[in-house]
Regions:
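C-terminal folded domains that constitute the principal catalytic or ligand-binding module
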Residues: 139-145
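Short, surface-exposed recognition loops or helix-turn segments adjacent to catalytic cores
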Residues: 93, 124-132, 162-174
């Protein structure tokens, strides 16, 4: 493994190694900052491994280097690297999606490495302080191991996907995930509908909760800390119910200005919609068991809901491409 924490060493890597593909993982801290802070970048290629220190080197010089990217559940990895200046290439492939397409029941990297490769990963260092310098030897070994195992896992998955003619499906689904992931950068305050303790409240309580959540979001951004460190959801609910009073003047003013807010309305399901949704779920289950394939890969639940509400399935972007080619005839029958 090569440890890189100097810009000259990173430049040398670019000149000396010209890989067609990279296996990528990151470590980051999402417990102490408003936005996750990139702490480590692990990369592997066919004949080597390097660990980059993003606290010391400028990753933007890597743009255009290295070919396709392979990651596991890679949305956050790709977005964090883009924020650090290293933009994802046109081809990014997610091995978690490959596992779902192939019908594996456990999707975590450690579980797949154990199930597919027969290797048990020691996860002791997973929650360690990755921003601390210097890293311990145990941290370095852990960081190196993930991309090495990811590289081996990819070889197995690619062969299996090829045998089932699912390579295009893998590429298309990975592209959808990357496109959806870009919306994660557009941070918004948490919706009050996501807080369990508020589900049976009144519009006045919901209005106060919305005001508190907006205040919490701005405070977290200014202080550069996670929102839960400003105020956790339980306290948000208690304050919205009027069980505790605000100490901060700015929060008191926000609550005073809060107006009643209705619970977002959902269209009432029609009898036809309920029957169609049930039929689509039964069709999805049948297809998933026959292939085998994860349910979400056959037909995402959000697509079932939209079709049940009257949208034509061929108009949905996610159902174009490989799904249309593989499922069109039987899906037409399920919808009819």
């Amino acid at each position: 493994m090569t440890w890189i924490d100097r810009q000259d060493d990173l430049k040398n890597l670019i000149h000396e190694v010209q890989p067609d593909a990279l296996w990528i993982d990151t470590e980051y801290d999402n417990q102490r900052y408003f936005s996750p802070r990139l702490a480590l970048v692990q990369i592997a290629w066919s004949s080597g491994v390097a660990v980059l220190d993003p606290l010391e080197v400028d990753l933007s010089i890597l743009n255009g280097w290295g070919g396709a990217w392979y990651s596991h559940d890679g949305t956050h990895d790709w977005l964090l690297l883009a924020q650090a200046g290293w933009r994802p290439p046109s081809t990014c492939l997610d091995t978690q999606i490959a596992a779902r397409l192939l019908g594996y029941e456990r999707f975590g990297l450690a579980a797949l490495v154990e199930d597919v490769l027969g290797v048990a990963i020691d996860k002791t260092e997973q929650r360690s302080d990755w921003l601390r310098r210097p890293l311990t030897d145990q941290q370095r070994r852990y960081a190196e191991g993930d991309v090495v195992h990811l590289r081996s896992l990819t070889s197995v998955f690619e062969e299996a996907l090829r045998a089932k003619a699912l390579e295009t499906a893998w590429a298309e689904e990975s592209a959808h995930v990357l496109a959806r992931g870009e919306r994660l950068l557009e941070r918004q305050p948490k919706a009050f509908t996501k807080i369990k303790d508020l589900r049976r409240a009144r519009p006045e309580v919901w209005g106060r909760a919305q005001a508190i959540l907006a205040w919490r979001f701005e405070q977290a951004k200014v202080q550069n800390i996670p929102e839960f460190r400003v105020m956790n959801d339980h306290l948000v609910a208690r304050m919205a119910w009027g069980k505790i009073r605000p100490r901060e003047r700015s929060l008191a003013l926000a609550l005073k200005a809060a107006e009643p807010c209705p619970w977002p309305a959902r269209p009432a399901p029609k009898e036809r919609s309920k029957k169609l949704e049930k039929a689509l779920k039964a069709w999805r289950q049948e297809q998933a068991e026959a292939l085998p394939m994860d349910l979400s890969m056959v037909l995402p639940t959000r697509c079932i809901e939209r079709i049940a509400q009257g949208e034509e399935w061929r108009s949905l972007d996610e159902l174009a491409g490989w799904r249309s080619e593989r499922f069109a005839d039987s899906l037409d029958q399920a919808v009819s």
